[in-house]
Amino acid sequence: MARTLRPSPLCPGGGKAQLSSASLLGAGLLLQPPTPPPLLLLLFPLLLFSRLCGALAGPIIVEPHVTAVWGKNVSLKCLIEVNETITQISWEKIHGKSSQTVAVHHPQYGFSVQGEYQGRVLFKNYSLNDATITLHNIGFSDSGKYICKAVTFPLGNAQSSTTVTVLVEPTVSLIKGPDSLIDGGNETVAAICIAATGKPVAHIDWEGDLGEMESTTTSFPNETATIISQYKLFPTRFARGRRITCVVKHPALEKDIRYSFILDIQYAPEVSVTGYDGNWFVGRKGVNLKCNADANPPPFKSVWSRLDGQWPDGLLASDNTLHFVHPLTFNYSGVYICKVTNSLGQRSDQKVIYISDPPTTTTLQPTIQWHPSTADIEDLATEPKKLPFPLSTLATIKDDTIATIIASVVGGALFIVLVSVLAGIFCYRRRRTFRGDYFAKNYIPPSDMQKESQIDVLQQDELDSYPDSVKKENKNPVNNLIRKDYLEEPEKTQWNNVENLNRFERPMDYYEDLKMGMKFVSDEHYDENEDDLVSHVDGSVISRREWYV
């Protein structure tokens, strides 16, 4: 009985599965089968197409893209899933239009590694269905396209490709800036972070928020690059001991690289003198002054001195402390200066020391105990008991009495002066005020005013601007301008007219010895009738007999 050959056309979607020409040639040597019916001839290509596609569609599984790190190892995965017999598996690398065999696994002859890959390529296991290899010590030349190929019988070859990208892990370092950080100086490079020969170029960032970064990048022919980042700041002594951190990020790194740097700010000494509590008195012992200095670099010299240039006995300078060996006396009063020096300069501080009188102490007199005498039972001899009384108390009481007397005298004198001043002010204010009261009697208007309001009509007595006393003294004829014939003149119809705007114009009597338009009348006109006038603070004189609105 003859075998039926299954032809091998290419399957859609299975472009990476190929059949060798030798299998087709071998198939042509077989006996021809009987001629099938016409319906079978039409269905045969479809059945054969379905058979091949089901057998070879996606038979090799690989990772399309693999990232390798220079100098390290990488695994290239290749799993073969076919039902046919696998006669050989191999790895090839594409170089342009040609390929180079990397490694071969034959079920009968074993493993074989070609050329430059010897000693660097190993198959993961001995199974023909797993062609995964490990490539050791990755170099730049290992990047490119690799093909995993499987040879089956009788269907031929099947293959899939993967692309290897070689990354170079950067070499990271952190160094101190070239210049020292001096307090108050210009902007200075504090630290330099370098990520050298990375592929691709690394990314550098800084943590610290004390300054700003400045980066430069240099590229090389092997596609690597070096980045240098400088951290700049304005130095200040308060930033001493602060931490800044360089953070390097790169795809070849499993995690970010972080390098920290402690700022070392140099500054001149900051000096302060302590130890004086303000209660140094004559006779006090065990006191000292201490010179505190904060400097970077540390100070190498401390010197004590006095502002007046004197140096009393009993002063001992040891390191940064000035000891007062002897009990204090008034000679130790003065201004003490401490000068501290380091490589950046000299600073000083001073302290004013005042030695006061010793505090008042109470000394008890020795007392004699009372001893009863038993020599004679009838006459008991005793000594008077002396009560303890401090000697200094009498002086204190005397001083307090004198001080009390002096304070009383001074206080009494001040009180008398104060009372005198207040009395003078009161009298002065009273003299400046008016001498009397306004005329406050109830005013009874004339009978004619009770009948009809004539508030806008001037009365005859209101036209007299001066009292009778003034008129009698002057003895001048009164020139009364208000005449009957004058009021009757037709051109003077505005006089005493209520509806006229000029109704308030009032004629005045004329006196020869007085000037018209005087604002005030002198006091000599009121000698005989002084009580009728009132003098005000502003200097004006008001008559009691007048009514004012």
Swiss-Prot record:
Gene3D superfamilies: Immunoglobulins. It is a single-pass membrane protein; Single-pass type I membrane protein. CDD domains: IgC1_2_Nectin-3-4_like, IgV_1_Nectin-3_like, TM_EGFR-like. The keyword Transferase does not apply. Its main location: membrane. Residues 58-404 are extracellular. Glycans are attached at residues 73, 83, 125, 186, 222, 331. Cell adhesion molecule that promotes cell-cell adhesion through heterophilic trans-interactions with nectins-like or other nectins, such as trans-interaction with NECTIN2 at Sertoli-spermatid junctions. Trans-interaction with PVR induces activation of CDC42 and RAC small G proteins through common signaling molecules such as SRC and RAP1. Induces endocytosis-mediated down-regulation of PVR from the cell surface, resulting in reduction of cell movement and proliferation. Involved in axon guidance by promoting contacts between the commissural axons and the floor plate cells. This is Nectin-3. It comes from Homo sapiens. One of its GO terms (cellular component) is dendrite. SUPFAM superfamilies: Immunoglobulin. The keyword Signal applies. Residues 170-258, 269-354 form the Ig-like C2-type domain. GO terms for biological process: cochlea morphogenesis; establishment of protein localization to plasma membrane; fertilization; heterophilic cell-cell adhesion via plasma membrane cell adhesion molecules; homophilic cell adhesion via plasma membrane adhesion molecules; lens morphogenesis in camera-type eye; protein localization to cell junction; regulation of postsynapse assembly.
